[in-house]
Amino acid sequence: MSLAERALNNAAIRDSAKITTPRWMLDGLEHMMQHYTKRHLCLDTQACDTIPAPMPGRKYMLYMHVPFCHTLCSFCTFHRFLFREDKARAYFVALRKEMEMAKALGYDFEELYIGGGTTTVLVDELARTIEHARNLFPGIKQVSCESDPLHLTSTEFTQLHGLVDRLSVGVQSFDRDILARTDRLEKFGEPEVVYEKLLRAKDNFPILNVDMIFGFQGQTEEVLLRDMEMLTRLGPRQITTYPLMVTHQTRKSAKGNLANGQQDVRKDYELILNTLNGHYDQLTAWSFGKSNDEGFDEYVVNYDDYLGLGSGSFSFLHDTLYVNSFSLRRYQEKIASGKMGVESSKHYSRHAVMQYRFLLSLFGGRLSKSYFKDNFGTSPYIGLAKEMAFMHATGSVKQDPQDPDKLQATPNGLMMGLLMMKNFYAGMDNVRAELRRPLGANDM
């Protein structure tokens, strides 16, 4: 999104954002999204052991997954295993080999995003992998990497200085009771300690993103406001704050101990928008930044095509989803035999891809009519007539007064985009849970 577009998006919420969409309508939207995710994010994939070569003129983004953690958080549904150094070092070697296979196919990338798990379980291997990626793919302009508060001030972490442009740190909350309930207090320390580590990390990376979650049990309006005020005082370059996601995998623990069953997500989201207003620009429905032209966690907004490497990663290339093996053993065997880690694929219809792009456009705060015309040969008002009618009827989008091609998301639209993306990610988490279910001890 251009600077001018982001400035106009911010104008939509600048004067005390107010979400007027009735709660029953938002509940209905969530039920509708759950229907569509169940329909489209299901395991009806076809066996596959290769990915296609890149298309001329297309932009690509590279994602790499590191599936190891020293401890496993109860609310996390990402693909991860308990850390073992021998397994992790062998994994990084395989990851670098898979990168070389992508290079041999002709790929280059504009951005690299490394997620997990905990990407920094072996900082020396991570640094070596990033250096290898930069050498293989000279088009990479920005490297983003996830981490947790534990590693921020370790001596070995300095190996990432100059290699990582954007560091995203999962904090979730500064409230002591919430951190204790989520088992993070014992792992990462008191909120004041985490705050000081973040303050020091700001000087070591061009972009520091702090990742927060709202919707926890016990997270009253006062607690959430205190979190937001601490964030603005800390002043990281970027903030990502999204609702707690309850999936099939986490439903029992999250509903019983973690999730706020009485949450009014509209009031929480209004508070977040209005607290960060004036300090940050809106990047997506749940991402905020000091600058308008930087990458952020939801890379799918800016890239139609991305390639995922590593066990448990997903690729979306040319309207087809590719799924890498969730078994570390099978992943290693495939790489050792000269094949990439992909095991299955699923092609999506033109209409399904249009709906997906519509979701991302709303989540990103803007919709380009010419984008749909160029990519699908039709206007969104024709190809997605029901969806567009609903957005206008609920006051979720409005015409950009400076650009007849663009529609802007209002606070109602940002609320819709947030809930739609929340349910989309929850659907992806359910897919991960199904793919992990058959794994046994020999798959580690």
Regions found by a protein language model. Name each.
Residues 1-61, 398-400, 437, 442:
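Flexible, acidic/Gly-rich N-terminal and inter-domain linker regions that tether
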Residues 43-79, 96, 106-113, 119-120, ...:
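N-terminal pre-triad scaffold of radical SAM enzymes
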Residues 83-102, 111-378, 439-444:
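C-terminal scaffold of the Radical SAM
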Residues 107-109, 209, 401-404:
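Short Gly/Ser/Thr- and Asp/Glu-enriched loop/turn motifs at secondary-structure junctions
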Residues 378-392:
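Short amphipathic alpha-helical interaction segments
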Residues 392-402:
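A short, conserved structural fragment
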Residues 404-410:
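Minor-groove-contacting beta-hairpin "wing" of winged helix-turn-helix DNA-binding domains
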Residues 412-444:
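Short, amphipathic alpha-helical interaction segments positioned at domain boundaries
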